[in-house]
Each structure stands twice: as C-alpha cells, then as structure tokens.
C-alpha cells in the first residue's frame, strides 16, 4: 500500500530513526493502519542493547507504533510534513510489553484513531511478532504547525 519512498513523504524521520518499512493496510474510513518494521541485526541499537543477547529497546517499539499512528494522522488530514505540520509523541497510557523483539523479527504495527481534541490525537496501538502480542498502548500525539 505504501513503500518506503512514500512513507518518507509522510514521516520526517530518517535513518537511523525511521522505524516503519512498509504500510500494508490503510483504511481512512475506519481510521486504522497496519505497517511493519523488519528488525535487522544491523540496527545500530543492537551494539549496546545487549551485545550478547540483542533485543529491541522498548522505547523504540513505542516510537515505531507512534510513527505508524503519525502516518495515519497525516493521511486522515490529507497533509504531509512538507505542508508545515508535525506530530510529536507526547505520551502513552495503558502501556504494556508482552515479550521481547529480536533481530530477524518482523514487527507488525497497528494503530486505530480514537479521538482528537485541540490538536491532541489519541490512538490505540499494538505491535506483534508472528501474531503474538509484543506491546500495546494508547499513543498520544500533539499536532504542531512549523
């Protein structure tokens, strides 16, 4: 549905912080998105987290979910960062980690729009690997004009 070139139009992030590789489903009417991140052993964070037992840092799983939610928000508004709008990750509620993410995993990211009020957007998000829950949270983003 969206390859990395189109994703780069909707996210301001770049290597090594672009954490969405592909969008496989995007339903504006039902306000949800499904995307994924291929987790490679070559990710820079694996050098220190942890060298003998590499796992993806939880904060980066949360960030990946927030980036998927950001793409959904931009698509819902029919805008892009180049239009002068950004979404900042400002918080999370109901955050839970279920299992670690390892090199070689395909991290599937899902986000559903819940609400917005005064440029504060809330999304229900989850991340899975091989159909098993890895992380879930309500992600809160602030819409800001540059």
Curated annotation (Swiss-Prot):
It comes from Pseudomonas syringae pv. tomato (strain ATCC BAA-871 / DC3000). It is found in: Cytoplasm. It holds the Pfam family FabA. Its EC number is 4.2.1.59. Keywords: Cytoplasm, Lipid A biosynthesis, Lipid biosynthesis, Lipid metabolism, Lyase. This is 3-hydroxyacyl-[acyl-carrier-protein] dehydratase FabZ. Transmembrane segments: none annotated. Belongs to the thioester dehydratase family. FabZ subfamily. It catalyses: a (3R)-hydroxyacyl-[ACP] = a (2E)-enoyl-[ACP] + H2O. It comes from the Bacteria. The active site is at 49. The keyword Oxidoreductase does not apply. GO terms for biological process: fatty acid biosynthetic process; lipid A biosynthetic process. It is an enzyme of class 4 (lyase). SUPFAM superfamilies: Thioesterase/thiol ester dehydrase-isomerase. GO terms for cellular component: cytoplasm; membrane. One of its GO terms (molecular function) is (3R)-hydroxyacyl-[acyl-carrier-protein] dehydratase activity. Involved in unsaturated fatty acids biosynthesis. Catalyzes the dehydration of short chain beta-hydroxyacyl-ACPs and long chain saturated and unsaturated beta-hydroxyacyl-ACPs.
């Amino acid at each position: 549905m969206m390859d990395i070139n189109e994703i780069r139009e909707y996210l301001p992030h770049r290597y090594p912080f672009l954490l969405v590789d592909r969008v496989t489903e995007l339903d504006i009417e039902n306000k949800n998105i499904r995307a994924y991140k291929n987790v490679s052993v070559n990710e820079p964070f694996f050098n220190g987290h942890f060298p003998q037992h590499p796992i993806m840092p939880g904060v980066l799983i949360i960030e990946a979910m927030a980036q998927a939610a950001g793409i959904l928000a931009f698509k819902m508004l029919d805008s892009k960062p180049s239009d002068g709008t950004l979404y900042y990750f400002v918080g999370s509620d109901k955050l839970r980690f279920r299992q670690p993410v390892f090199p070689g995993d395909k991290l599937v990211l899902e986000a559903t729009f819940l609400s917005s009020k005064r440029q504060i957007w809330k999304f229900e998000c989850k991340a899975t690997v091989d159909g098993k829950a890895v992380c879930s949270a309500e992600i809160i983003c602030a819409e800001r004009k540059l």
